[in-house]
Amino acid sequence: STKNIFQIISNEQSQIGSLHKNLEFYVEINSLNNTISKNKNSNQTIIEIPLHRFSKNDLVQPTFLIGENLLDCHLYLTYSRWLSRSHWNQRLPSKLNAILIPGGGDTTEKLLNHLSQDGRYFSLCLTDSDIKYPGGNIGETTKKCQKLTLKEISHHLTIPVRASENLLSPEQIHQVLNIDHTRNILLNNLKKITRFRNTDAWLYFPLKEGIRPIIGPHQKNSRDEYWQITAYANDSLENEFLYPGISTDLLKWTVDYLKNYDPEKIKDSNLISAWTKISTTVIAWTCASEPIRA
């Protein structure tokens, strides 16, 4: 009955309490306004939505979470759920709920633009920077997303790392490799690049492919200078690594691992900073109550 529904909402509200005060974004339903508006209040963004917009079910559907692929989306949601209850002991009486949408290349920007202009659903898009070294240029996908004029119920976040793999700590990668004996050989590669931990270099290192020497004549650029890449005339070094990578399957292995195990505790300040930004945004845009079945 209607009475039971309101009782459930009332009980839930008392549980949630002042949770919204800890969120970067939250929605207020306003019976007086006719249009959706967005306002800044100190360090929070408040999206005001008129009551009549809820006469249809569109805005009560889960947020569309757009990533460059589904593995990225799963990683962001899994870590955000875990961080909300472990690192900051934030009690979430609600769950994180989203419809995961894989983008990739130009598709990411087109999906975000379509959902935003459609204006019926909440949408959140996360893209990595694709920056190759500190001070380098952001990638084309993120650049295009940043140029979009988004409506109030859509949001884009640029993640300050080269790729989502760079959000993984050395401890997390070690556990993912150690659980399968066929990957143990890669632990030595991890040991060689752990020297970069808790530095800007870890955020931009090509974890999937590593860094090879340059063979033949080459005009050094800023990337080469940063990673101290040397050009060699001897092509016998073509298959050698200056710094080895881990694997192009690292993200897939990690997402599979996290289906059965909690993430490893994050120790490095640069990763804590990156994950704090990601998780506070994801929590604000995807936290949702359980469906009411009165």
Regions found by a protein language model. Name each.
Residues S1-A294:
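Acidic, divalent-metal-binding catalytic cores of TOPRIM
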